[in-house]
Design a protein with these regions (language model features):
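Glycine-rich beta-strand-turn "strand-cap" elements at beta-sheet edges
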Residues: 1, 8-10, 35-47, 71-98
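Short, surface-exposed ligand-recognition loops at beta-strand->loop->(often short) alpha-helix junctions
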Residues: 8-21
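Conserved N-terminal glycine/acidic-rich loop preference
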Residues: 4-5, 19, 46-55
């Protein structure tokens, strides 16, 4: 069953391009990864949305995702509220519309 993960980020002022470039370098060849999009949700705010063939593939890729994050962690601001620099969520698709 298809799964998605999303991660919310806030980038430090003036470091947006560096943040985006770090993702371009990854071009993740991870098993089960089907598509990745980064959306800009506000000034310095971004969300990454990734589609996976199944939840097991997503779970197996978590160490790679963390290693990737470590490569650009210094470009991120703390989100506050005890979240740290990311706000990740993931899960299987339970309803597909168009």
């Amino acid at each position: 069953m298809t799964a998605f993960n999303t991660v919310r980020f806030r980038v430090k002022p003036g470091r947006d391009q560096e943040f985006l470039e770090a993702h371009k370098k990854v071009v993740a060849d991870w098993p089960g990864l089907q598509r990745v999009n980064i959306i800009k949700t506000g000034d310095g705010s971004y969300c990454i949305v990734a589609e996976w063939s199944d939840m097991d593939s997503l779970i197996a890729a978590r160490p790679n995702m963390i290693a990737t994050l470590d490569g650009f962690r210094d470009t991120l601001e703390d989100l506050g509220g005890g979240l740290g620099v990311t706000d990740p969520v993931s899960g299987p698709v339970v309803l597909t519309l168009k």
